[in-house]
Each structure stands twice: as C-alpha cells, then as structure tokens.
Amino acid sequence: MTRVAGIDPGTVSFDVCGLDDGEVVLERSFETAAVGADPGILVAALAEHGPFELVYGPAGYGLPLVEASEVGERELELIVLVREDEPSGPMGVGGMRAIVRALIAAELPLVFGPGAIHLPTIPAYRKWNRIDLGTADKVASAALCIADQARRLDIGIAETSFVMLEVGGAFSAALAVDGGRIVDGLGGSSGPVGARACGAMDGEVAYLLGSALSKRTIFSGGGMGPALEEGAAKAALSLTVSVPAPREILVAGRHAPDVLEPLAARLPYPVRHVENAAARGAAILADGLAGGNYTPLVERLRLREASGTVLDHVRLHGAERIRLR
C-alpha cells in the first residue's frame, strides 16, 4: 500500500492529486496567483490528506530526481531559469521559489523530477541547443498517458506509442512516446504557439527585441483559434519523425476541448482527450518511485537515470555568459 501525491504547477492553476494504492483520494485545484501569494493553502491541502510516503513536487524546468534535502539556491535557479539581469516584476509562475521553499519547510517527503531533456531515452542529438523539450510537468503528463493507453488498449507499457499534445492555459507542448519511453519533445517555449505564450521564437525577432527580451516575453504573444489549432497539429506531425507509427494523438491541458475537433480533422491518427494528466501523472510517478503499482512504468521511463541540467546542451555563441538568479 502506497499513499502518494503529485503537484502540477501550471501558469493558471496549481493542481494536486493524491493516490492511495493507485486509487484517487485527493484532487484539488488552486489559482496559481493564490498559491503564489500564500503557499500555505497548498501545504494545508497536502497535510489534510497525508501523511504521504512521497510527494512529486513542482520542479519547473526539471531536476534529475532531487530530494528536498538536496535543494539549494542553485537548484531553485534551475527550476525557474531567470536571468541575473531580469527586471523585477510579475513573470512566469509567480512565487515559484516561495512555493517550493514552503513545501520544503513543511518537511513533506518531496522529490523533484526531471524535464524531458534530463532523460536518457532522448538521444543527445535531439537535445542540441535546447533547454525546453518538455518541463517536468509534461513528463508527468506523458506518464499518465502511457498508463492510460496501456489500460484502454489492453497492451503492455512497452507497446505504447503516441504523440501527446498538452494545450495548457498558457503554453502548448508536445512529447513523443515510443515503446513506452519519451523519445523527443517540443516544450512550451520551443514548440507551437500557446493560448497565452508565443512558443518557439523567430531568431530575428529575438535579436531585434534585444534588451527588451525578458521572461515576460516568453509568457506573451499567444493566440487562440487557427493559430493554436494549426500549431498543435504541426507539432504533432513533426514528432512523427521520432515516433513513426503512433497509435494515437493524446491531447491534455486546459484548452484540449477547444482543439480536439480541429485536430481530428487535420491529423491521420485517432485523437483522444486525457483529463487531469499532469497532476495525476505526477502522483503516478510518486507511486512508482515509492514501490507501488506504477513501479514498472517508472522503470520503463528510466526516471532514476535522469541526469545533468537543462543548460548542458546549449552551445550557442554567448552561452558561456549565462548567469541565473
């Protein structure tokens, strides 16, 4: 019997899921702004339904399975990725550092999981000059999708294959899963346009923005309608290079219902909706790490072999001058 929880740190909402021996015992959602202003509401929700053997914490861009006791200032910097010279003001997931610190101070049994770029299942050449192949919550979403497809189609984890599109409240992202493993990805800041975020940026636009380019820029310039729909379709099709015969396109995230019909019309694969993917996926990963029912899934993902930092593969001119705070 394992009792675990997972947290999805979204731009719009923080979602929490608790599992007891694989059964859902907690599902709560809080506005991100409210959690940023008072992380205690998140801590209280977890304490009310605890104790937990393990809590899969909010890791932003990801850490290679780091326990709470090992999280220092450098790890916090890598979670949020804010430049040393970034102007002060609201940006990204507001109060993320304070939220993580509050969870750690509450002495919860936390672990902070990897982003896609930390995983050994993605070849190094696909990581070239990339940071965001999918944040830690996208890895969690993919875990839920693997479990979901295996159950629905009555197949083994190693037989699952799909492209997951997460069309969230701000960002859109995509991950390729083949043989039950994450093999490629397009993260929210390097993929299709999102509802509130620009996605992959034209290099010339970045150059011309110059000193005006900030974290707030990445969280701006999004669009709905055809821009969101076609961008998601292009992302899914581009990842079929890495997973040539996906069984399905699985769509998660706040705006998934808005794009299901347009995607089904554009894509030559079955398109299905998956709900509450990131929070439930985080809880599934916690369960597997704690030795529960989802241990084979964690082993298949090679989660314990995650390594490095999100900065390891950046080889651009000027990268040596990157400084975080």
Model-derived features with residue positions:
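Short beta-strand-loop/turn "lid" adjacent to the catalytic site in phosphate-handling enzymes
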Residues: P51-R130
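Glycine-rich phosphate-binding/hydrolytic loop that grips phosphoryl groups
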Residues: P262, P268-R325
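N-terminal glycine/serine-rich phosphate-binding loop of ATP-dependent small-molecule kinases
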Residues: M1-E70, A105-A106
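Glycine-rich phosphate-binding loop plus the immediately following alpha-helix
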Residues: K127, I131-G156, G179-M224
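Phosphate/pyrophosphate-binding loops at sites that engage ATP/ADP/AMP, CoA/4′-phosphopantetheine
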Residues: A44-L54, R152-G156, A233-E248
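Adenine-nucleotide phosphate-binding core of ATP-dependent small-molecule kinases
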Residues: A212-L250
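Glycine-rich phosphate-binding loops at beta-strand->alpha-helix junctions
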Residues: A245-L263
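Gly/Thr-rich phosphate-binding beta-strand-loop-beta motif of the actin/hexokinase/Hsp70
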Residues: M1-E27, T160-G187
